[in-house]
Each structure stands twice: as structure tokens, then as C-alpha cells.
């Protein structure tokens, strides 16, 4: 159930009874549970508009809520707030229903969409580094939530598998007579660095590299065979990283830049035909009045270079048109570094004008900040090099395993390694996903691996605590009526019933940290409930009801963490 929506509906009816129908209710959870479960903040705005005394109007609304099947009490506070306390019978009935529902009371959206989500998308011919982490895990979590809430999700890994860097690589390998050799990703990286130096310093080599790009685009069999070898090696590495991270990305989700190669010229020509793109110094350019350059003139969105070459803009236009036209997307999400915001704003504006992005479809830039080191600079190795993602994840598992062994010296090596991997990978992912994605954040091993505070280990431990209860509980009845009498029982129940609203917020806004904050709040409340309301020592209906609350808490934590892409453990 959507608890927020249910309470808001009751409040709206009370607003109508008080003569202010249609005014925004402005419903929020109370900051202090002693004041109730929710607070209505919309009366003051309605009173100002209606030229009434806000406290008197608030009292009318509160009186209209009296005897309500959902609201136990409505008390006016301050200049016109209304604090609401929910009926324990209402909470108990819905906890019982959620516990006995395969989806834990979370309904699917009434308006499902086909959503194409573009995330991870590394450039190939080099190893993935920490800069690829955020897009990969943020996109994966958003895609999971969208699926769980009833949408059709199409994942797209728009890898950089085309362009000048591949011409450089081919030119270098031919020059070094290594074009028939077998090689690995580490070799490719070494070759690429050497090729880049040659490209920057030797005009003749640069011309040769560009010639190989033309051959690649023209379908030259020898060049294509080398290119495919580069791509296969790179994608194999990327998939191994995705598997370690537990992402849902699969090889069939790869739709790289090369996929749209044949569509680039038709798109450029179409924009000219529609009068959007014009010739400017030999290039095809869309001038956008919505964006100004430093001189205050319309910004240039170049779709084809002088000489006929194409850019990211060309590929992204063709790609967007494909996703709307062929994949039938109603919503497009691009999970990309926030520094690319202007490019995507221009892409969406151009696509809208060209008719590629119809009015009934929505394109969203899901930007994110930078992972920083403790020195406040982008996260690097001590020598200043980019941190390879494989190395980061390996260190996470090693650190977590050492921590697990320290806390549980009796564990066998295999069990400690299994727990260490789950805790380590979960810690890295949660440290990122628990932050507002638009912000930069500091990468801190000690903080993320702590078993206290808003961390994955804390939430994973909360889940194991629930499992421990049921290993000792013996018989209990999930179908028996739920009875709530203690304040913390009611608080925990109300929190668990907010799950649907939180997931819908994440689906609507693409902010996974809302879910992380909710899970931390639920786990913290369960800890307080566990201490204040003995579960196994209680008797009769009280014992059974507390077990029901514990079970639903465990279910919610497990499902919620899974939607963040984080595994749980029965024992830690």
C-alpha cells in the first residue's frame, strides 16, 4: 500500500469538508514521533488564500478527521500545522496484508512505461577505472527499482567502440608488426598509450590512423577483424567487472557507438532537410537559440565535421532516434557524469525540434558528481594514477574479509571469504548510492566498512539479526491477526508501510539515496524496537505480532538492498 497516498486522500477529504477543497495538503512525516506519524502543512497557505485565521481553519480540518478509520487523532500545533496519529488497527491490518503479500504490500505503478536506461558505457580498449563506478551502480539500482515498480526496462550499455582511438591502435599494431599477434587487455592499454604519443607527435602517423578509421567505417575485412578482437577483449573484461559488482548488465545489453554508424549520415542529412542544420565552414551545425555562447550568440551543436566526419552529437542523435522509434521508449534515462549536462540538454532540444523526441516521450539527464579522495581531489592512487576498478573491488573484498576474520576468528577461510566479498562489494556500492548522486563524495574505507551508522555492513547486520530471531523462534503464525500496542511497534509498522511510496519516489526522480535513507531508518527503528519490545520473551498474540513485524522488516531490508544491488547474509 502507499501509506502517504492513503493519508493524503483522507486529509484532502477533510480539506473539502472544511471548505478548502483542492488546496494542496502538503503532507510530511513528523520529525518527532512523539508528535504523531504525519503532519499537514498546507492549511496556512489555504488560509492566506481564503483570508481566514489559519489555526481556526486547521481546527476545522482536524474536526473533519475525527472518527476517521485511518486517523486516530488530529491535533493543531503552532500557527496551523496538524499532527496526525494513525489508528493502530489500521496499521495492524496493513502490516498483516503486507506480510502475506509476495511484494510486501508494494503495488505496481498504474501507469507503466517502457524505459530505456543508458548506463556504465565505458570506452573500450582500456580497463575500467573508478570513474566508471558511479554510472554503473547508480544506473543498475535505478533500473532495478523501475522494473520492480512495474515498468518495462531496456538496459543499454553505450560503449565507446568506434572512432579515432581504434584507428590509432590499428596503425600502431601494423607499424610494430603485431597485427597478427594474440594479446590481452593489458597489452591493448600499453599499445594505446604508445599510439597516442605517436598520434600527437607524428603528423604522418596521425594521417595513417585516420586512414584506418576510414577503412574501419568502410568495412575493410582486415581492419574489422582487428577491431572485433579489441572489442571482444574489452567487453569480456567489462562483463567480469559487472559480475563482480552484481550488476544486471549482460552482453546482450551492449549497444555501442558502432551500432549507429550507418545512421549518422541520414540523420545529418535529415536535419539539413528539416532546416535545423546549416552549413557553416564546411560543417553541418544546429544553432540553438536556447543556449548562448560567450559572445551571447546561439550555441553551435555540430552534427557533422568539415570533411564529413562525425562526433558524439551525431551518434547520440541517431541513438536517441533509434531508442524512441525502434525500442518504443516512453522515457529515456542517461546516467552520465554531470559535466556532460550541457551536451545532453542540447541533444534533447535538437531531438525535440527534429521530431525524434515526441511530446509524449521524456528524456532525462541523470547526472552524478565525482568520487573524491580524502584530500578533496578526484580519487587517485598514491602515485597519482587512475585507480583501476578491478583493483578497488579486490581491495574492498580483502579489507572486508580481514575485518570479518577479526570479528569472528572461529570462521573457516571459505566462509570468511564469502562473507567478506558480500560485505566488501556491498560497502563500496552503498557508500555511493547512499549519497545524493548529484554531489561529489569522499571515498573513505573506514567509514564505508563500519558496522555502525548509515553503511551497508550495518544494514546487512540488521538483516542477520532478524534471521537470528527466527532461528530461535520455533512456531509462529504469519496469518494470525496482527496486534500493535506499544509505541515502538506502531512506529516500526508505520515505517514499513512507507516502502511503496519510497520506491515510487526513486522511480520518479532516479535518486537511489531516498531508498538508502529509508532502509537505514527502518533498520534503526527495528534496533530500537528490538531493545524495547522483547520478541521471544513475549507471550501469545504479542509474541506472534512482534515476530510478524520482525519478518516484514527482514523482507523489506532484503528486498530494498536487492534493489540497490546489494546482497544480504543469514549469518555474519
From Swiss-Prot:
UniProt-listed Enzyme Commission number(s): 6.1.1.19
Catalytic activity: tRNA(Arg) + L-arginine + ATP = L-arginyl-tRNA(Arg) + AMP + diphosphate
Subcellular location: Cytoplasm
Placement of sequence motif 'HIGH' region: 122-132
SUPFAM superfamilies: Anticodon-binding domain of a subclass of class I aminoacyl-tRNA synthetases, Arginyl-tRNA synthetase (ArgRS), N-terminal 'additional' domain, Nucleotidylyl transferase
Class of this enzyme: ligase
Keywords noted in UniProt: Aminoacyl-tRNA synthetase, ATP-binding, Cytoplasm, Ligase, Nucleotide-binding, Protein biosynthesis
CDD domains in the record: Anticodon_Ia_Arg (cd07956), ArgRS_core (cd00671)
GO terms under cellular component: cytoplasm
Subunit structure: Monomer.
Family indicated by similarity: Belongs to the class-I aminoacyl-tRNA synthetase family.
Name recorded for this polypeptide: Arginine--tRNA ligase
Taxonomic source organism: Neisseria gonorrhoeae (strain NCCP11945)
